[in-house]
Design a protein with these regions (language model features):
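Beta-propeller blade signature
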Residues: 76-82
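Lipid interaction determinants
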Residues: 1-76, 88-305
Length: 305
């Protein structure tokens, strides 16, 4: 999600976490645990789970992991991202325009965005700035579970951050509350997480499973990228979500896959994507369908790097 270039043609997946969000007129905060997994095809799954706050009952876990409560879900969605044509203008004009309505909250690395040898529109000098712009097309959206509901546009400008090559600042506009019609500017700081090897695997592994059953009003996705796996299923208005991570749960123990978050009563077949899982065998071809009871999941993509 934080890639600054055109859609990747390589085999690497991307792991991103959000450091903070800032709505126009407010201070930056991070009320959620937000994790985005993106495959080389730009298929992604983005889950945002509310963290405990001072008024959260003490019995609640840092992340919901027993099926609820559903109010701990801020937002979860999945689809395909695309790179839009960048905004190109003279550097001085862009800086002035950007600071007129939404000055970046962190220093921007214009050296990664500027071509100082280029001539701007109308023959202006001083170099041009080209700001990448991305759109995330939602095919599954926890805020659109009722028939006829459509996801709101989701796109933003992606700025390189000075001194932080792993970071990207997204600036855009969207409704804070769906259906309110009140659009606000926002800024989000995204960080890329290093992908790690898992178990005895010699390459970082990834896979995308998808489910589309209109007769059940069901759509779902499972994406594994290296040491993370996330699943999202919406069926007949019911939301099910899982997040897994390959980690050391306690000192002295070997690393294992652990479920770190779960919402909903259905158990999703994330284990198919783990080492030796049903979706990871060499004999399993892209396009194959794996059955989980009455639910058929198609192997949409496999990748390793």
């Amino acid at each position: 999600m934080v890639q600054l270039t055109a859609n990747s043609s390589g085999a690497a997946g991307d792991i991103s976490v959000r450091e903070w969000i800032c709505w126009e007129g407010e201070a930056p905060i991070e009320p959620t645990s937000t994790l985005v997994l993106t495959a080389p095809s730009n298929t992604f799954v983005d889950t945002r789970l509310l963290l405990p706050h001072p008024f959260t009952p003490t019995a609640e876990l840092p992340l919901p992991n027993t099926g609820g409560p559903l109010h701990r879900l801020d937002w979860a969605f999945s689809g395909v991202s695309e790179t839009l044509p960048p905004t190109v203008m003279p550097q001085t004009q862009h800086v002035a325009a950007a600071h007129a309505h939404a000055p970046p909250l962190v220093p921007v690395d214009y050296s990664r965005l500027c071509d100082f040898s280029a001539t701007g529109p109308g023959g202006s000098s001083g170099g041009t700035v080209s700001v990448p712009r991305k759109r995330w097309n939602h095919l599954i959206d926890s805020k659109c579970v009722a028939p006829g509901q459509e996801p709101a546009p989701d796109e933003g400008d992606m700025y390189a951050v000075a001194g932080r090559p792993e970071a990207c600042l997204e600036i855009g506009r969207m409704e804070r509350e769906k259906g309110s019609g009140f659009v606000l500017r926002y800024q989000e700081m995204w960080l890329s997480v290093q992908a790690r090897l898992v178990g005895s695997e010699t390459r970082r592994q990834g896979v995308v499973l998808s489910l589309d059953m209109p007769e059940r009003r069901a759509r779902g996705v499972i994406i594994r990228v290296a040491q993370f796996c996330q699943a999202l299923l919406i069926a007949n208005g019911q939301i099910d979500l899982e997040r897994w991570e390959y980690l050391v749960a306690a000192p002295g123990n070997p690393p294992e896959w652990h479920r770190v978050a779960k919402l909903g009563s259905r158990f999703l077949p994330c284990a198919w994507t783990f080492e030796g899982g049903d979706a990871m065998g060499e004999e399993v071809a892209v396009g194959s369908t794996l059955q989980d009871g009455e639910m058929g999941w198609q192997v949409q993509e496999r990748f390793a790097w």
